[in-house]
Amino acid sequence: MAAAVAAPLAAGGEEAAATTSVPGSPGLPGRRSAERALEEAVATGTLNLSNRRLKHFPRGAARSYDLSDITQADLSRNRFPEVPEAACQLVSLEGLSLYHNCLRCLNPALGNLTALTYLNLSRNQLSLLPPYICQLPLRVLIVSNNKLGALPPDIGTLGSLRQLDVSSNELQSLPSELCGLSSLRDLNVRRNQLSTLPEELGDLPLVRLDFSCNRVSRIPVSFCRLRHLQVILLDSNPLQSPPAQVCLKGKLHIFKYLSTEAGQRGSALGDLAPSRPPSFSPCPAEDLFPGHRYDGGLDSGFHSVDSGSKRWSGNESTDEFSELSFRISELAREPRGPRERKEDGSADGDPVQIDFIDSHVPGEDEERGTVEEQRPPELSPGAGDRERAPSSRREEPAGEERRRPDTLQLWQERERRQQQQSGAWGAPRKDSLLKPGLRAVVGGAAAVSTQAMHNGSPKSSASQAGAAAGQGAPAPAPASQEPLPIAGPATAPAPRPLGSIQRPNSFLFRSSSQSGSGPSSPDSVLRPRRYPQVPDEKDLMTQLRQVLESRLQRPLPEDLAEALASGVILCQLANQLRPRSVPFIHVPSPAVPKLSALKARKNVESFLEACRKMGVPEADLCSPSDLLQGTARGLRTALEAVKRVGGKALPPLWPPSGLGGFVVFYVVLMLLLYVTYTRLLGS
């Protein structure tokens, strides 16, 4: 009899002993241990039947014990072929562990557990998750080490789920419905057969992500929005983007690489894109934690300026392409005058392209502020009638567009045609936008400014203005007190003191002021002169490339404008001209080959400061935005620095015709003398 009882104990465990043994046999302690566990469950609310090799739930437990108050049930390490029916009747159950059993399917009665928040089904033989599992208020779902081939589409209905572990399964893809898990913090898909990760994962507030030991070759760019991510595990994957050397450096380098890719992909849409794609905009913390103040404790440290602060400023690398700057540039360019629109439409059939960077550069705002301060009382918006302020604001976007290098030739031809048709130097172009009392003032200022531009010497005009101001020249009366006659094409404007001359906000004036040819006499203002030929930006770029390659002793990239925009080459040039003039240079790393806009601007500002220390006049310097955008004025500043400090003057951009003829004559004469000398020696 004892041998007959020992065999069931070895084969079937304690449950077999409890059901086949008789009182007094060795199986009695197993029954007593199960009964003791049930008694403790009634007293404590926690049922622990783990590691007992049970195939069935203890019989008669529901009739003998009141288990309605059980909140935690541990049925792990047993041999249940399915979820016990008695466990599905525990309506107060909040946590259920069926770890390491023999489950092949789940009982539909699990849907009765309306208070269940924790469910552990790992180390079983499940091949699918039924839909009724997704109707439970689960916060933790663990189904690792099973045979799941796919997740159900209803997985997105688990809105309160915070941890999902589906590791060590046979998943080949993840459903896009995962984006519905708005509370998910921990996602573990380790040891599956995943080849791609859905883009929607970037919208989740994940803190921990593990997709190691899969077949993933590319991390989605949208993952750069996972700003709360603390841990990311991606080993044992054939990753190609980001490269392996980037992934080995850690989480910060991975996210910087993804942020750079996102910026390049956003800028590749072109200026005609209506706005930046919403998939690259960082989600605010208030959307993830409504009603709570977010203190940055879960940030990843990406793009942090201070190494001690683990704060990811996700907007810092995308300020220039944000939707706010796009709307500002749109509002600044909409209220343009009808004549301006007509000229744009007749001269160029292409639509007006939007320049995100040019519309919101701090350097341009500072330059515009200095021009406003130097404006005389007649032309300032606050001195006379307040209604003239909108008109002056309408004309500013046109001046911004004229400074673009690609429209230089177009605006040159347009200015020349208008001046030839007007019959007088500097006839105003936008008379229809101004009041009659202001037309003569603007016309006179434009006339004197245009004549000063023809002289090719804005510096002399400024010096004359300063001299006149120092001698106490009388200031003209405000335009609002006495209306002036309208300036026509045949009437020349009355002479005005040079101290009140206003610099026009014109690209042609800036170009001519950069290539001034010397001081001009007072009577030269009334004498028309031939236009100086404005140097082409391509010629400037070619000459600057030759100078930089000869100075730095190394070849430069093909796209020199983009290389100069980072400011690294300019700072190296300054240090080559005068050692230690730029003490600190921001250089790109192999992982992130492109500098951020903030670091590039700091390099450019350091170069301009070094130029000031080397003796380059302030009038020959440009704003940081000119160097960042690669305009002709910025290129000329770099050449001027080499010219001032390099010890020898640069070759001129266009040699004078008289000098060229003399050079040709001299070369021909030397050749004739050489031929004559050789013939004399031969004879």
Curated annotation (Swiss-Prot):
InterPro entries membership: CH_dom (IPR001715), CH_dom_sf (IPR036872), Leu-rich_rpt (IPR001611), Leu-rich_rpt_typical-subtyp (IPR003591), LRR_dom_sf (IPR032675), LRR_domain-containing (IPR050216)
Transmembrane intervals: 653-673
Q: What is this protein called?
A: Leucine-rich repeat and calponin homology domain-containing protein 4
Q: Which organism is it from?
A: Homo sapiens (Human)
Sequence ranges of the LRR repeats: 41-64, 67-90, 92-113, 114-136, 138-158, 159-181, 182-204, 206-226, 227-250
Q: Where is the composition biased (Low complexity)?
A: 1-18, 461-481, 511-524
**Topology in membrane:** Single-pass membrane protein
Q: Which residues lie within the region annotated Disordered? A: 1-34, 268-292, 326-436, 449-539
Q: Which positions carry Phosphoserine?
A: S279, S281, S304, S307, S309, S313, S432, S457, S511, S513, S517, S521, S589
- Broad class of the protein's primary localization: membrane
Keyword Membrane attributed: yes
Swiss-Prot/TrEMBL keywords: Cell membrane, Leucine-rich repeat, Membrane, Phosphoprotein, Repeat, Transmembrane, Transmembrane helix
Compositionally biased tracts (Basic and acidic residues): 330-345, 357-376, 384-418
* Annotated localization: Cell membrane
- Chain intervals with Polar residues compositional bias: 449-460
